[in-house]
C-alpha cells in the first residue's frame, strides 16, 4: 500500500506553486548521510516506498533510515474517455512536491561507502536527480 494521509481537511487541492528552493527540510536533521534532491518534481508514495525498500535491502537491516518526505498532496484524474465538464475527477494518488535542496532520506550507523551505494540505487527509483550529502565531521 502506497503512502497516503490518514485524514485530510479537504479531499481535493489545487495545483499550487512549484517554484523556489526548499526552505525547510534542506539540511541533515537525524542521520550522518542523506539523499538531497537537485531538481524539482512530484514524488508519489509508491516511489518513496520503492526507494525505501531498495535502501533497506542494500543495508541488510543494518543502520537506521529516516524518510524525510511524505505525500500530502492529492492528485485527481478523470477516467478514460469521459467528456469534459462534470467537475473535477476523483483522487487517484498522493504526491510529495519536492523542491531542489530537500533532503529525502537520511541514514546513520553504516559506513559511508555503503550509504553512498544505497542512495545511488535509490536515486535510480526517483523521478529527479539527487546527490549524496554527509554531515560535517562524518568520515566519508
Curated annotation (Swiss-Prot):
Matching CDD domains: Ribosomal_L16_L10e (cd01433)
Assembly information from the UniProt record: Part of the 50S ribosomal subunit.
Function recorded in the entry: Binds 23S rRNA and is also seen to make contacts with the A and possibly P site tRNAs.
Family membership noted in the UniProt record: Belongs to the universal ribosomal protein uL16 family.
UniProt-listed InterPro entries: Ribosomal_uL16 (IPR047873), Ribosomal_uL16_bact-type (IPR000114), Ribosomal_uL16_CS (IPR020798), Ribosomal_uL16_dom (IPR016180), Ribosomal_uL16_sf (IPR036920)
Pfam families according to UniProt: Ribosomal_L16
Disulfide bond annotation, renumbered to this chain: none
Chain intervals for the UniProt region annotation (Disordered): 1-24
Annotated coiled-coil segments of the chain: none
Species whose genome carries this gene: Opitutus terrae (strain DSM 11246 / JCM 15787 / PB90-1)
Record keywords: Ribonucleoprotein, Ribosomal protein, RNA-binding, rRNA-binding, tRNA-binding
UniProt GO molecular function: rRNA binding; structural constituent of ribosome; tRNA binding
Gene Ontology biological process terms, A to Z: translation
GO CC list: cytosolic large ribosomal subunit
Protein name in UniProt: Large ribosomal subunit protein uL16
Amino acid at each position: 500500500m502506497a503512502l497516503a494521509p490518514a485524514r485530510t481537511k479537504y479531499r481535493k487541492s489545487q495545483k499550487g506553486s512549484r517554484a523556489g528552493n526548499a526552505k525547510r527540510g534542506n539540511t541533515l536533521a537525524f542521520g550522518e548521510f542523506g539523499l538531497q534532491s537537485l531538481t524539482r518534481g512530484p514524488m508519489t508514495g509508491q516511489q518513496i516506498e520503492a526507494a525505501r525498500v531498495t535502501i533497506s535491502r542494500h543495508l541488510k537491516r543494518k543502520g537506521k533510515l529516516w524518510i524525510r518526505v511524505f505525500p500530502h498532496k492529492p492528485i485527481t484524474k478523470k477516467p478514460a474517455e469521459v467528456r469534459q465538464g462534470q467537475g473535477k475527477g476523483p483522487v487517484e494518488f498522493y504526491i510529495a512536491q519536492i523542491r531542489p535542496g530537500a533532503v529525502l532520506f537520511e541514514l546513520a550507523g553504516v559506513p559511508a561507502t555503503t550509504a553512498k551505494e544505497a542512495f545511488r540505487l535509490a536515486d535510480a527509483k526517483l523521478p529527479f536527480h539527487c546527490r549524496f550529502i554527509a554531515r560535517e565531521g562524518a568520515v566519508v
